[in-house]
């Protein structure tokens, strides 16, 4: 089976698990799903040095994450600057909500690449945001999954994982715990 077909099937599975809005007790404005992330946060990042290699060597970074609403709240722009053992990170995420599809598209970039990656697409269900995309990594077609969870008014958790077997197994490679900065 082709890698694209595997990706489409994995995405279809994710979407089939989404609740039927017509059966919902009250309407949910999914365009505000990322409001918990707006503002300035301290971020502690753990990053797997060599993903999908069998290595379990991690490195850490600490820094600041800022996030502002754009497009009347139907999107947001996140910027991360962090320093650690392996140097300086500058990362950006552009999040856009498609009200017709009831899904978010997340476009990542870094100061290293200088371009937007293909989007991760997904939604929130029961307080967990799950987003998937297919990418090429070291010459291999992989799935990438991002999870946002444990959101409170002052903190949340993010985890990115790769799958080289089209979603059968996942290896976390970027984990961030964020705490809101006050003052």
Question: Language model features by range: what are they?
Answer:
Residues 1-3:
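N-terminal secretory signal peptides that target proteins for export/translocation
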Residues 6-17:
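Bacterial N-terminal signal peptides
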Residues 18-183:
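Hydrophobic small-molecule pocket/channel-lining residues, especially in calycin-type beta-barrels
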């Amino acid at each position: 089976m082709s890698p694209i077909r595997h990706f489409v099937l994995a995405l279809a599975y994710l979407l089939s698990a989404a609740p039927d809005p017509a059966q919902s007790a009250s309407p949910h404005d999914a365009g505000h799903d990322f409001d918990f992330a707006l503002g300035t946060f301290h971020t502690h990042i753990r990053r797997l040095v060599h993903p999908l290699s069998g290595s379990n060597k991690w490195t850490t970074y600490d820094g600041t994450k800022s996030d502002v609403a754009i497009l009347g709240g139907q999107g947001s722009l996140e910027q991360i600057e962090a320093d650690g053992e392996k140097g300086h990170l500058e990362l950006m995420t552009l999040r856009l909500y498609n009200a017709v599809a009831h899904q978010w598209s997340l476009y990542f970039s870094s100061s290293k690449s200088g371009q937007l990656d293909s989007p991760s697409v997904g939604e929130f269900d029961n307080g967990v945001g799950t987003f998937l995309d297919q990418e090429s990594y070291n010459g291999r077609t992989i799935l990438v999954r991002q999870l946002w969870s444990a959101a409170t008014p002052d903190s949340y958790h993010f985890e990115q994982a790769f799958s080289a077997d089209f979603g059968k197994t996942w290896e976390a490679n970027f984990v961030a715990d964020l705490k809101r900065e006050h003052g």
